[in-house]
């Protein structure tokens, strides 16, 4: 059993070890080792396009995750315990958004927005001098569509396990609805909200398929990696991959430690 | 009170509603409309009403066939590899190591799937595993650019998504049930079949559904590890929109893919219900 | 002193000028902050630094083909103008066209091939070039065969980058000799080279060379001829190593022995690994020329002109040719290239080897039947 687990971990980490190993190569080839050097790390960090792509990715992931978390949580709050047609329509929308393949979302968003922009721009441009085009906005919209639905599912799932007696008690004790939410409901659904935010951020940060279609002239990190790979993989790409992974490992372990500390603290 | 409550609900739902309308309803409606249109001379879309695009769908039969073979196969392979690991993590590992080992399952997920798949090109290419096998006398093994390579890439890419739901299901399992079974003299393998496996079914179904759905729309792994020879519906869509610029036919293929997915997932949930696996929308998470 | 060399933005310059005129700052201050002081001090000796004062922004986006530039030249461009070049690489003209057609590509310069230009002009996606902004382009020094497709109805839309051919690259240590016919290419794929042959991932050359195998025109859109080509391709498919336009890695590591190949890639591989050779199909095939062009909605047009002009400087162009191994149609550039390069049979094949080759036609690119044929081939 233990051996088996070891084998699976080896399977998971072998390619990553290879990426990390070749990132230290001194030569140009990304698939063989020619001496040891850190120069590719320096190059990646000094490459303005890498930094800009990273910044775009972080910006899009952060904004879309914030929006998705807030809007999704609001919807989940409203949907809990709700019945009727509106509820059914929303349930359907959530299910479709989660189930439809990313590639279909990407393509559909692309052709819909291009068509709408072509209709709107001839009116908009002379009036305001602005021109709508694909970019950060469409990325946030398309990523958020999927991640907001995840948040709805997570938060609603959590809401449904809440003890209604607590809320009744709070109401009976004269708390305003908002007071009840702030002091009773919110602390209890917070883990689900945070989990939703993290999932949303990760999804958007790592997404290539949807971004490939709707990014317009923007370049996110996965898009940069994709187009660099077509130019021939260099150890620079391996260095970027290794750094992103190391950073996420640090964040994960940090989060883990914080969680442990907060759990260790006795509850008031 | 009732009035303010429904008004609050409306307020809370409006942003999400607008988002769904603009980014889900509108795009899907456009795809549906375009799928009845015609291809303009230089590509793109020309308005019209024709069923020609749908009539042409059999031209992508092979893509649908490949997807519908490799997606279930990939799901099954992931399941078979993930289950023992999830079992090990949930049942055998001491709590001290558990979190650590769980984190290690997700970490690869944080490196771009693109870069990880490219690492497999090296591993499966002539200088990788085949060269290793040649040392043992297995000459001329070709792995890269085959359906097998795509399968490896798929399992590799989606394994964590399968491990987690199963782990969660097994974690919830009441260990006393197994102790009781052991006390009653049930052999471990029977206890597994009669207690552990049925109780972990919700996790198995969730994981399988998740991986299956993602595989149905996959195009990256086949195009990287399949050398352009393993063709999924996703690849057909990419070619139609990013090479031959046939938007109406591409839209029809997209509609076809969504329909096929709805049917297969629907059948799957019905079968799952028969297994008594509980709530389905929860199964999605 | 260091500060003086920093370029000053146009707006800040105007403000300083205004303040100087009003007399609120001294002449010395004005010349100092605007950099004109330095410029005047070194006038005559350093024209490149003057070029910095002409503000083209700090970026330019180039959409081009794989292995087609010397990265050092982009660094030189940055040093000279302050603008960084973002290079996006594409695999086919179809792909470029699709991206540009969807709008908002964000490109400033792109590199269409001869047969794609009429389509861009018809669709209104390409900018007529202002040749006064490309002084390094001297039409008189170019071989008209590789320059004429850039001009349509008297308007110049593209200036020539390189020309080349699509032939066969072979690893002679595995193939046991030169492969110089499409007959051997496609028949060998099903026989002695089983599992070792690569074809391009776009219809023009893959279908075109299958047509040539049967003795038809590379550009044929005749349904009966296309049917024969399809039959051949589908028969060959299970024996192929891959369908991909990114063939260098597989050829270099020995997994693939034979591939459809562009001139420069053939030269690059041959330079590093002499056992990899390059030959033209003796039945025919493609000859092409690529052009620098500017999309209609290019966001940084000044930078686009500056980049094109920079790359067409004969000295830069010669450095590029040395790096990528594609022939140049510019006599001034060729005068700077070493004789052995000009005599290289890969880069400048003998005229009789070129004579059976055909330029791709505009209709070949947009023909929907060829696109569908390619899709059937890939999904078979």
Regions found by a protein language model. Give the residues of each.
Chain B
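Transmembrane alpha-helices
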Residues: 15-26, 76, 156, 161-175, ...
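Glycine-rich helix-loop "coupling/hinge" segments at transmembrane-helix boundaries
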Residues: 43-48, 219-247, 282-285
């Amino acid at each position: 059993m233990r051996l088996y687990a070891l084998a699976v971990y080896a399977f998971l980490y072998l390619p990553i070890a290879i990426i990390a190993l070749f990132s230290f190569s001194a030569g140009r080839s990304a698939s063989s080792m020619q001496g040891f050097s850190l120069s590719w790390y320096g190059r990646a960090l000094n490459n303005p396009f890498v930094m800009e792509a990273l910044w775009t990715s972080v910006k899009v992931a952060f904004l879309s995750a914030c929006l998705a978390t807030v809007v999704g949580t609001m919807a989940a709050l409203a949907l809990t315990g709700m019945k009727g047609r509106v509820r059914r329509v929303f349930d359907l929308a959530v299910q479709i958004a989660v189930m439809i393949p990313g590639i279909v979302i990407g393509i559909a968003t692309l052709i819909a927005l291009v068509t709408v922009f072509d209709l709107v721009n001839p009116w908009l441009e002379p009036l305001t001098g602005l021109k709508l085009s694909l970019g950060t906005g469409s990325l946030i919209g398309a990523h958020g569509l999927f991640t907001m639905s995840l948040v709805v599912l997570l938060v609603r799932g959590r809401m449904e396990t809440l003890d209604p007696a607590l809320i009744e008690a709070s109401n009976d004790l004269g708390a305003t609805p908002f007071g009840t939410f702030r002091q009773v409901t919110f602390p209890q659904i917070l883990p689900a909200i945070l989990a939703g935010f993290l999932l949303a951020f990760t999804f958007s940060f790592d997404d290539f398929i949807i971004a490939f279609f709707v990014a317009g002239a923007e370049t996110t990190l996965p898009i940069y990696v994709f187009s660099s790979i077509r130019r021939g993989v260099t150890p620079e790409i391996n260095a970027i991959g290794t750094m992103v992974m190391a950073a996420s490992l640090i964040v994960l372990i940090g989060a883990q430690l914080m969680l442990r500390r907060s759990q260790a603290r006795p509850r008031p | 009170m009732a009035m303010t409550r429904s008004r609050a609900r409306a307020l809370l739902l409006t942003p999400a509603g607008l988002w769904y309308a603009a980014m889900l309803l509108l795009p899907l409606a456009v795809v549906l409309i375009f799928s009845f249109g015609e291809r303009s001379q230089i590509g793109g879309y020309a308005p019209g009403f024709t069923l020609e695009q749908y009539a042409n769908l059999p031209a992508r039969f092979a893509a649908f066939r490949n997807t519908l073979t490799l997606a279930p196969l990939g799901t099954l392979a992931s399941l078979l590899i993930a289950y023992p690991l999830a079992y090990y993590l949930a049942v055998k590992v001491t709590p001290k190591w558990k979190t650590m080992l769980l984190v290690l399952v997700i970490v690869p997920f944080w490196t771009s799937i693109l870069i990880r798949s490219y690492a497999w090109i090296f591993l499966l290419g002539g200088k990788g595993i085949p060269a290793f096998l040649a040392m043992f006398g297995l000459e001329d093994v070709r792995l890269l650019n085959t359906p097998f390579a795509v399968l490896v890439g798929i399992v590799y890419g989606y394994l964590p998504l399968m491990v987690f739901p199963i782990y969660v299901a097994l974690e919830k399992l009441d260990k006393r049930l197994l102790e009781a079974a052991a006390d009653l003299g049930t052999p471990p393998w029977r206890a597994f079949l009669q207690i552990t496996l049925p109780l972990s079914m919700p996790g198995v179904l969730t994981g399988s559904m998740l991986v299956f759905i993602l595989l149905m729309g996959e195009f990256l792994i086949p195009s990287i590890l399949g050398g352009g020879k393993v063709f999924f519906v996703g690849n057909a869509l990419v070619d139609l929109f990013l090479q031959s610029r046939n938007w109406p036919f591409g839209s029809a293929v997209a509609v076809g893919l969504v329909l096929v997915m709805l049917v297969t997932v629907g059948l799957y949930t019905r079968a799952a219900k028969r297994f008594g696996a509980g709530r389905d929308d929860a199964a999605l998470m | 002193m260091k500060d003086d060399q920093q370029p000053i933005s146009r707006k800040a310059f105007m403000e300083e000028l205004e303040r100087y005129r009003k007399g609120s700052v001294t002449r010395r201050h004005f010349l100092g902050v605007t950099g004109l002081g330095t410029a005047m001090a070194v006038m005559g000796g350093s024209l490149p630094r003057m070029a910095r004062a002409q503000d083209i922004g700090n970026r330019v986006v180039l959409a081009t083909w794989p292995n087609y530039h010397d990265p050092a030249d982009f660094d030189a461009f940055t040093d000279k103008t302050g603008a960084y070049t973002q290079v996006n690489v594409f695999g086919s003209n179809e792909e470029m066209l699709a991206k540009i057609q969807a709008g908002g590509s964000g490109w400033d310069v792109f590199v269409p091939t001869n047969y794609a230009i009429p389509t861009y002009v018809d669709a209104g996606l390409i900018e007529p070039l202002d040749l006064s902004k490309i002084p390094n382009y001297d039409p008189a020094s170019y071989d008209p065969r590789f320059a004429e497709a850039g001009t349509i109805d008297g308007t110049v839309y593209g200036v020539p980058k390189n020309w080349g051919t699509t032939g066969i690259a072979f690893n002679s240590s595995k193939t046991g000799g030169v492969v110089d016919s499409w007959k051997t290419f496609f028949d060998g794929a099903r026989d002695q080279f089983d599992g070792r042959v690569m074809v391009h991932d776009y219809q023009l050359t893959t279908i075109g060379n299958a047509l040539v195998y049967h003795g038809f025109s590379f550009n044929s859109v005749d349904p009966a001829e296309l049917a024969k080509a399809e039959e051949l391709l589908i028969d060959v498919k299970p024996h192929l190593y891959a369908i991909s336009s990114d063939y260098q890695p597989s050829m270099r590591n020995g997994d693939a022995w034979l591939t459809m190949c562009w001139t420069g890639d053939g030269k690059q591989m041959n330079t590093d690994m002499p056992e990899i050779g390059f030959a033209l199909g003796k039945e025919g095939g493609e000859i092409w020329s690529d052009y620098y062009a500017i999309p209609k909605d290019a966001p940084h047009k000044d930078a686009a002109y500056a980049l094109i002009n920079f790359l067409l400087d004969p000295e830069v162009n010669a450095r590029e040719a040395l790096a990528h191994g594609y022939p140049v149609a510019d006599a001034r550039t060729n005068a700077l290239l070493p004789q052995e390069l000009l005599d290289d049979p890969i880069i400048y094949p003998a005229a009789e080897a070129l004579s059976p080759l055909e330029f791709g036609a505009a209709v070949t690119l947009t023909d929907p039947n060829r696109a569908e044929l390619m899709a059937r081939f890939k999904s078979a």
